Amino acid sequence: MRPLNRVLATIAVSSLVLVAGCSSKKSTATSSPSASASSPAAAASTSASASTAATSSAPASAAASGSAGSGGDVTLNLVAYSTPQPAYAKLIAAFQQTPAGAHVKFTQSYGASGDQANAVVSGQPADVVEFSLLTDMTKLVKANIVAPDWNSNAQKGFVTDSVVSLVTRKGNPKGIKDWSDLIKPGVKVLTPNPFSSGSARWNILGAYGAQIKEGKTDAEATDYLKSLFKNVIVQDASGSKALADFVGGAGDVLISYENEAIYAQAKGQVVDYVIPNDTLLIENPLAVTTTTKHPVEAKAFVDFLYSQAGQQIFADIGYRPTLPGVTSTVNKFPTPAGLFTIADLGGWTAATTKFFDPTTGLITAIEKSNGVATTK
């Protein structure tokens, strides 16, 4: 599921228990390794919006013995977009059972990807960062907070993948099969506002790119987006709020991450989901910061996330692993026939300018014509 060779020429949680990818709010909670290990919901029980989880303590035996030549525990600050919070509840607990992680505590901050990146640039402590969008990692590189070669590993810096999917009511009563169904009269669509939600940008680029994959021109793909937004009944500020609204009864279909739909089903939400034949590969970047006071421990944690054990945890909770050979008995992860990547749309710089520039962006114009805010 790596980028295709061809480059095109013209170029989502219930309000009770789920945590989704692009919220603009924060709340606080405290988690411990025992709570995290027993239930991912324990770390995600704060709200359906983004959250900041306070210190996750190291095992008592490690605290009592000091450890790893450091003379005692160290605390890593993990700053991430909010979707993987349930996964990190398990990942941190598992890492703390390894020799490298036995003396490591964590302070965790989860929120909208762009907001999290801006917070780190503004001074929020961070040892390890994971974002929804590559552009957010680029902000930190430009600020000298992440090294220019952060993506030099075999996975090119992407710790997990997903795909843009269509979440439907149980039984799919509207018969949603692909993107063309979203612009039919009477179909009510939910997707977040792309000027506050990173997941919304994946959704929009997935919708546009699918039209190009089907052989349509740029003008025709643009017309599709205009028709799509006429059917969008709510544009929440975050992916989590959009999923919460959908689970609460709003709309017929929600455009969202595949992993969000999988996690919603795992938590008992009455939804189904469809992966279109032509859809966009979502890639989530991870890095150690240059400002970390604990580079050895931070790198050890990142290495664990890329390891067989770490990737297995990601896979079992709904993310597509980036380490070759990792599979899940829980989730099958079918490969869509027309899977494409952001590289096929010219890369993030070109796509951001074309679609989301605050003055000249295509989506900016569509949103303004519909009376939707294009600023946070």
Predicted features and spans:
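Ligand-binding pocket segment of bilobal, Venus flytrap-like solute-binding proteins
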Residues: K213-D278, P285
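Bacterial N-terminal signal peptides that target proteins for export
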Residues: M1-I11
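N-terminal segment of the mature folded domain
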Residues: K26-A29, P33-S39, A50, A60-S196, ...
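C-terminal motif of bacterial Sec signal peptides marking the signal peptidase cleavage site
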Residues: L18-G21
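Extracellular/periplasmic juxtamembrane helices and adjacent flexible linkers that interface
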Residues: R2-P3, K26, A37, A68-S70, ...
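Periplasmic-binding protein-like
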Residues: F158-V163, L225-L228, D236-A237, A266-P295, ...
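Ligand-binding cleft/hinge of the Venus flytrap
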Residues: A93-A100, S180-S240
